[in-house]
From Swiss-Prot:
This is Small ribosomal subunit biogenesis GTPase RsgA. Its cofactor is Zn(2+). One of its GO terms (cellular component) is cytoplasm. GTP binds at N129, K130, I131, D132, G180, Q181, S182, G183, V184, G185, K186, S187, S188. The keyword rRNA-binding applies. Zn(2+) binds at C261, C266, H268, C274. It is found in: Cytoplasm. It is an enzyme of class 3 (hydrolase). CDD domains: YjeQ_EngC (cd01854). Binds 1 zinc ion per subunit. One of its GO terms (molecular function) is metal ion binding. Its main location: cytoplasm. Belongs to the TRAFAC class YlqF/YawG GTPase family. RsgA subfamily.
């Protein structure tokens, strides 16, 4: 058998659209057996960005035999399955798209994605979209907080084209996933960058009887700007399987203060002689600290439940 390498573009019901890396031809891929052996229990054995080994068994049809190692994954907690659910793999950047006004910016959502990005060595970029409709006080405040922490923040509008050039610069020669809650204009932003994205989404939506212009599955496509992965609008981005003891390491503003805490195991909550809590509003934003406490509580509750 002549094994070839393929990149997963999208998939549903264990049927995948895969790109042969040499010829750049698209094939339909299925597992040789009932499931793909990956060596661990997981919700999504294959996602856009995965590289797989397979062989052609019929015209434009491939048996997928093996998934190659992933350099990283963008994941969230799937409560129903009680597992990490991989959304996309092998990416360089994640663009976290939020709205400047409505729907209201969800900083807790952004912070959770930032944590996973930091954990997986993915470069996060925060995009505040729909700025032609004005920017809320909350969005402006968090924009400044994130910029002060060193995160790149882009402000965009698909109507005035503001910030679109900067987004294209981020995409150049890289693999980038767009993620955001429903209604923030994520897919409209991608469609402005490359109209072929909308065509791809609509073809899949029509095939599986979904509404038009609705991303229901993660889908990867090669644009002139770079490789883009569009993802479904996500209501919640849980990270419950992250060990709660590690959470503090993903809030970069704690770094310069934590070394002065009396106790090495300090979680920066109510411990005595905590340099982090004594630095609130003096280098550490209270709003970000509130986010830390909320996420820490969720992680602790999950660990207690799991026991």
């Amino acid at each position: 058998m002549n094994y070839l390498e393929f990149e997963v573009i999208w998939g549903v019901n264990n049927i995948y659209s895969i790109l042969e890396l040499n010829s750049k031809l698209i094939y339909e891929g299925i597992f040789k057996g009932k499931v793909l052996e990956t060596g661990c229990k997981e919700y999504s054995p294959l996602v856009p960005g995965d590289i797989v080994l397979g062989y052609i068994y019929s015209s434009r049809k491939v048996y997928i035999d093996k998934r190659l190692s992933r350099k990283n994954i963008l994941w969230r907690y799937n409560k129903k399955a009680d597992l990490r659910q991989t959304i996309v793999s092998n990416i360089d950047n994640v663009l976290i798209v939020s709205s400047a006004n409505f729907p209201e910016m969800k900083n807790f959502f952004i912070d959770r994605v930032l944590i996973v990005a930091e954990e997986q060595n993915i470069v996060p970029i925060i995009v505040i979209n729909k700025i032609d409709k004005g920017i809320s006080q909350k969005a402006q405040e968090f924009s400044e907080i994130y910029e002060n922490l060193g995160y790149k923040v882009l402000k965009t509008s698909v109507k005035t084209y503001e910030g679109i050039k900067e987004v294209k610069e981020v995409l150049k020669n890289s693999r980038t996933s767009f993620i955001g809650q429903s209604g923030v204009g994520k897919s409209s932003l991608i469609n402005l960058i490359d109209s072929r994205a909308s065509q791809s989404v609509n073809e899949i939506s029509h095939k599986y009887s979904r509404g038009k212009h609705t991303t229901v599955y993660s889908i990867s496509f090669h644009s002139d700007s770079g490789i883009i992965v569009d993802t479904p609008g996500i209501k919640e981005f849980g990270i419950e399987t992250l060990p709660f003891e590690n959470l503090k390491y993903y809030f970069k503003e704690f770094e310069n203060f934590a070394s002065f805490c009396k106790y090495k195991s300090c979680l920066h909550v109510s411990e005595p002689y905590c340099s982090v809590t004594s630095s609130l509003d003096n280098g550490i934003s209270k709003l970000r600290y509130e986010s830390y406490l909320k996420i820490l509580s969720e992680l602790k509750n999950y660990k207690n439940y799991a026991r």
